[in-house]
Amino acid sequence: MAESEINNNDGEPVFAVLTQYLKDLSFENPSAPRSLRPREKAPQIDININVNANPIGDDNYDVVLSLSVKASDDSETLFHVELIYGGVFHIKNIPQEHVMPLVFIECPRLLFPFARQIISDATQNGGFPPLWIDPIDFAALFQKRVAEEQKNSQTLSS
């Protein structure tokens, strides 16, 4: 997006991806080459995802997806991938009540396909079939986060 478009002063809503970045990637294959042998059943895949965001400067937010994917077969860990993938978003002239949903739903939704591809490539480069993570309902994650924050604030005020 052109600098003049980001810095418009006419009050039009602005939502722009300024940059995306890979902050951290770890792939562990602790039992290789034994873990690469053909298996009779699919491994158990455990996926944990977290979304964090921090304001940086005026109207910019650093949004970070943290994914941890662990594949195991019985008691053996086949692989463990950890990824931290982020983006900086420019959000301006958006009503305040819409900013946090935009930051915690739309921003991670835009980042997710890139993070998903990195994890797929890492598992394939590690000698396993590519792992395609199913799409994630970031709206549900945001609603859960809001409900937990409300519950915690009620607990603290009691």
From Swiss-Prot:
Q: Which UniProt keywords apply?
A: Chaperone, Cytoplasm, Protein transport, Translocation, Transport
Subunit composition and interactions: Homotetramer, a dimer of dimers. One homotetramer interacts with 1 SecA dimer.
Protein name, per record: Protein-export protein SecB
Where does the UniProt annotation locate this protein? Cytoplasm
In UniProt terms, what function does this protein have? One of the proteins required for the normal export of preproteins out of the cell cytoplasm. It is a molecular chaperone that binds to a subset of precursor proteins, maintaining them in a translocation-competent state. It also specifically binds to its receptor SecA.
- What cellular component terms from Gene Ontology apply here? cytoplasm
Instruction: Tell me one Pfam family matched here.
Output: SecB
Entry similarity comment? Belongs to the SecB family.
Q: Which GO terms describe its biological process?
A: protein folding; protein tetramerization; protein transport
PANTHER family the record matches: PROTEIN-EXPORT PROTEIN SECB, PTHR36918
Provide the species name: Bartonella henselae (strain ATCC 49882 / DSM 28221 / CCUG 30454 / Houston 1)
State any single GO MF term.
unfolded protein binding
